[in-house]
């Protein structure tokens, strides 16, 4: 039998392969090859796939977009991502999926356009992340700049104490002091930001607007009991009350829930989080989730004896 007549892989095996490729996206050295493999599978099998497999394709492609935005920003990665997003946008028919993929395409093009528009000098640095080059060195981190300024300041002050101040040393000292102050203004906000998890912003306005509203019926009254109440206003629920339902299935009066979600992004009862409009916070959550998965993987590996040394 020739290759052209060989049977196509079953949907089950395709799902397993997509699962494995999605995991490979977390490994930087495997990212680009994984994206290319996902692209090939999408091109060859999406049109004949079942709705559930099509959904899995969409989830994996969306994961590629998330990883590009939050972790791997090298130009080559974005080029591979753009090709995948364009193929996916061409194939999908669901309106919301197509809209999201269009935004992924636009963001990839914007990212690559920014790289193209950078001054020629900047292209003489690193060919890719981690590459060692003999061209100009990257800028020093701010902490090292401050350390060098402190050393210079201490040297000048030491010279003044032994030889007495001169007009030149007084001027140099004043200049160094000003540079130190300016540098601290740049460092302190970063220190404060890194001191712990960021404060959770309000829930996304679009998500809140789409929360379903249900009517409290006699059947629900029997289910929850006569003492059922809105936990925000503490009023007992009565038949006919309009209730807004969160993804965690907890319900509240819409006028009670709105002020809460204007300031928080979580359920008042179980703290299940809703998406927010703050991309920086969403990126932080994504990194925390990945870090937690890596910690669990390491713990499981140690328990399983994968990293035992003799």
UniProtKB/Swiss-Prot annotation:
Tissue specificity of this protein: Highly expressed in leaves and at lower levels in flowers and seeds.
GO cellular component assignments: cytosol; nucleus
E.C. number: 2.3.2.27
Processing after translation: Auto-ubiquitinated.
CDD domains associated with the record: RING-H2_RNF126-like
Any one Gene Ontology molecular-function term assigned to this protein's record: zinc ion binding
Subcellular localization: Nucleus; Cytoplasm
Catalytic activity field: S-ubiquitinyl-[E2 ubiquitin-conjugating enzyme]-L-cysteine + [acceptor protein]-L-lysine = [E2 ubiquitin-conjugating enzyme]-L-cysteine + N(6)-ubiquitinyl-[acceptor protein]-L-lysine
Pfam name, any one: zf-RING_2
Basic and acidic residues: compositionally biased ranges: 285-298
Record keywords, A-Z: Abscisic acid signaling pathway, Coiled coil, Cytoplasm, Metal-binding, Nucleus, Transferase, Ubl conjugation, Ubl conjugation pathway, Zinc, Zinc-finger
Record-annotated membrane-spanning stretches: none
Coiled-coil intervals: 276-306
Impact after mutating residue 230 to S: Loss of E3 ubiquitin ligase activity
Deleted gene: phenotype: Hypersensitivity to abscisic acid (ABA).
Zn finger intervals (RING-type): 230-271
Pathway the protein contributes to: Protein modification; protein ubiquitination
Superkingdom in the source lineage: Eukaryota
SMART domains: RING
Entry's Gene Ontology BP terms: abscisic acid-activated signaling pathway; negative regulation of abscisic acid-activated signaling pathway; protein ubiquitination; response to abscisic acid
Disordered: annotated segments: 285-310
PANTHER family: E3 UBIQUITIN-PROTEIN LIGASE AIP2, E3 UBIQUITIN-PROTEIN LIGASE PRAJA
Complexes and interactors: Interacts with ABI3 (via C-terminus).
Function according to Swiss-Prot or TrEMBL: E3 ubiquitin-protein ligase that acts as a negative regulator of abscisic acid (ABA) signaling. Mediates ubiquitination and subsequent proteasomal degradation of the transcription factor ABI3.
Protein name, entry field: E3 ubiquitin-protein ligase AIP2
Organism for this UniProt entry: Arabidopsis thaliana (Mouse-ear cress)
Gene: AIP2
